């Protein structure tokens, strides 16, 4: 498909929707329950096109008179005499071969295209509401807005504190927010370790470290610090796509396809952006940040952390 979107030229976009009510088919003016179809030669009634798709809970008979196989899903087929019949998807392949397969592929492509057209048209019609949801996510997901979280993260590891304090936080706090302290092992612990290594001989004792690391604090959601660039990408995604969304009528097909592809990630990206804002708010809480004081011994460093954490009390 090239040029202008072909779906908008269709007489009725609804024809591509999956039919689940058999009454919709029976009410069609050209529908017949059974027709004698000629599969070879030039004479007789031929398959014209596939014009609809259905799926029912109960099985129905194929409309090809010589077939009659029961099936639950299939297609509405138009015939060369203007009539329409129901045709099982397997029946069509068995009776019409490549011709049916090609028409089936074409119909499916048109149906997918129609669904995409409707999705983009709905996105265009709901654009203002979508913008408001996006802005609400940035501003009101928690106590702190997106920008305030961004500034808080910068203040924590980007320059809001002294160089020494910042480097200590970066070096001593793991990416998951764990803070460990190195402490001496007891003689009993070292003896147990040697025993576990299977070497208790005083002459050939293997090296056993005299110290161990113990967890002294955990900064909740600290990994947001190192993932915040992803939040910025999500924000950029919404700002850009809100500028790009427009009425698909008359839209060049290459632009249409590109926008539809980007739009598929909209809901998932919104959830991810909201998650970043929620977790950023949990990170920047006084009782969470105050745990960083365990990294420092000097009163001025501890005071600096307390003052920083106090801004989020």
Predicted regions and their residues:
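Context-gated lysine
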Residues: 14, 34, 46, 59-61, ...
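Charged linear interaction tracts used for macromolecular binding and regulation
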Residues: 153-225
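Domain-exit/linker segments immediately C-terminal to small folded modules
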Residues: 8-9, 14-20, 80, 86-184
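Extended, amphipathic alpha-helical scaffolds
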Residues: 115-146, 206-313
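N-terminal cysteine/histidine-rich coordination modules
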Residues: 1-71, 76-77, 83-86, 91-101, ...
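Detector for Asparagine
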Residues: 5, 30, 38, 49, ...
């Amino acid at each position: 498909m090239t040029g202008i979107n072909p779906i908008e030229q269709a007489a009725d976009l609804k024809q591509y929707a999956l039919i689940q009510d058999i009454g919709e088919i029976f009410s069609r003016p050209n529908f017949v329950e059974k027709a004698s179809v000629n599969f070879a030669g030039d004479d007789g009634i031929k398959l014209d096109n596939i014009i609809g798709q259905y799926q029912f809970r109960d099985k129905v008979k194929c409309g090809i008179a010589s077939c009659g196989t029961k099936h639950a899903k299939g297609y509405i087929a138009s015939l060369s005499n203007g009539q329409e019949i129901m045709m099982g998807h397997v029946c069509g392949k068995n009776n019409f071969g490549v011709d049916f397969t090609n028409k089936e592929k074409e119909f499916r492509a048109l149906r997918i295209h129609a669904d995409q057209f409707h999705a983009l048209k709905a996105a265009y019609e709901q654009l203002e509401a979508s913008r408001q949801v996006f802005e609400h996510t940035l501003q009101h997901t928690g106590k702190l807005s997106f920008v305030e979280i961004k500034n808080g993260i910068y203040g924590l590891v980007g320059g809001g504190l002294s160089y020494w304090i910042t480097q200590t936080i970066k070096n001593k706090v793991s990416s998951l927010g764990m803070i460990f302290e190195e402490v001496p092992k007891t003689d009993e612990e070292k003896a147990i370790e040697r025993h576990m290594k299977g070497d208790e001989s005083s002459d050939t004792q293997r090296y056993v470290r005299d110290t161990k690391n113990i967890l002294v604090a955990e900064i909740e959601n600290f990994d947001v610090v190192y993932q915040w660039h992803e939040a910025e990408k999500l924000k950029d995604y919404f700002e850009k796509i809100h500028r790009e969304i427009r009425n698909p009528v008359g839209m060049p097909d290459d632009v249409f396809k590109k926008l539809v592809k980007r739009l598929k990630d909209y809901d998932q990206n919104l959830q991810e952006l909201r998650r970043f804002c929620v977790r950023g708010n949990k990170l920047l809480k006084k009782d969470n940040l105050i745990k960083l004081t365990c990294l420092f011994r000097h009163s001025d460093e501890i005071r600096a952390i307390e003052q920083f954490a106090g801004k989020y009390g």
